[in-house]
Amino acid sequence: MNLEKLGRFAGLLEPMPCIGLAYIAAALEQHGCHVRAIDMFAERLDAEGVVDKVARFKPDLVGMTVLTPSAPVCSLLSQMIRVRCPEARIVWGGVHADVFASEIVASRDADYAVHQDGEVTVCELVDAIAAGESDLSGIDGLTWLADGIPETNPARAINQDLDGLPYPAWHLFPYHRYGLLPFADFAKPVLTMSGSRGCPYRCDYCSLIHTGGKVYRRRDPIKIVDEYEYLVDRFGVKQMGFIDPIYPLVKKDLEPFVNELISRGLDKKCQWLSETRADRLDTETCELMYAGGCRRVLMGIESGVDLLLGNVNKNITTAKVREGVANARAAGIQTVGLFMIGLPGETPEMTKETVEFAVDLDLDFAKFAITVPFPGSKLFEDRWQKDLFRDDWENYTTFNPDPDRLIYHPPGYDPAQLVKMQSWALRRFYMRPRQLRKQFVDLRTISPKMLLYGLYGMAI
């Protein structure tokens, strides 16, 4: 990602653990490969710095996780690596690579693109490269060049045995530099875990089906605790984040998970947070989560207008949101509301209604992101079919200070006004006396540095 494009919002970013790449690294190590991991953002490297590290390692295969805003940087890295390491092959994974696999290999940004779960696919690719094979048609879940023409092999069968995967190879990453919420981390080190893959919901703005898959799969709760304990003991983790879009989704898994955490004393050693839907937070669920050490939930609320929630197939109501937030607060869990402004059909008046809804909920934290139709989402597909999409990928960011670079705005909603509304939303929510007291007296989670960045981001 080009941080310069984020303008005044750049300082609000903090490196987060890349669990997908860590899973791939672990699978390759288990397969007998010598693996090196580089986190460009966490290590504060420019492109030349990354390529220098790659060249010193002399790799046979270079892999990158590619999100849409980082695609131009990854393309540049690929070009530079081909010059410095001409014998190395390049493989891309992630949402962007999944959606644009044929274009990526045709343009030579990468030699291969991996689709969805990549652990087995990459190991088979390594074996084929080592054996000097040119025909890769037998590797499911791979796009490659066959006689100069992009060829996408059949999809790989969904991996139902998530507990059979090795733990992510965090020892290869600068884990001590990671955060989860730059404005509100409890303690460090922090790492992430996955209790499931896939999602049964089909929100129009989400591209998850291109990484986690359409099929929802979950892990054994006891096995999850085993990994939790390993991360606490091995890396001294103080705050754990579940990267599942909804955790826990299956209520019957929560009680054994919590009981096992308590029996091992992990509820006292490490706090955890998860993202979920507000309508999954009944009283019993919240009380169990708190007992097990959960101290914060992130809820994808999106909007305070029921019409807009329906427009993006969220399948929830504002009444259910109120109920879930109240249950979490009653249990002692801090609440983070994730909102989107500029949804299809939205007007400035509706944006104000959403912000006032966030204020009325009395959330501990709130994030107001400008809607972006990310590749892989239905919002993007709709624009693709109407030939309205744009390929200036570096501008696919939810905090964009330049209205001329906004990827999307609802018809009739002036882009400049939408950008101003985002800054106003942050000021309206955070600059209230009650909220200021909460941050600095009750929660004490915002550092002076992040306060200054936040005020600058609000354009105060």
Positions of predicted regions on the chain:
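Short, solvent-exposed turn/loop segments enriched in Gly/Ser/Thr/Pro and often Arg
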Residues: F41, L67, H96, I243-V250, ...
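Radical SAM enzyme core and accessory elements
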Residues: Q30, V51, D60, K378-I460
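Non-catalytic positions within long, well-ordered alpha-helices that form the structural scaffold/packing
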Residues: A55, V105-A106, V232-D233, Y290, ...
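Catalytic cores of alpha/beta
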Residues: A101-A106, T285, G345-D360
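Short glycine-rich His-centered loop
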Residues: M1-L13
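Radical SAM [4Fe-4S] cluster-binding motif and immediate context
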Residues: M16, D163, P168-L338, P348, ...
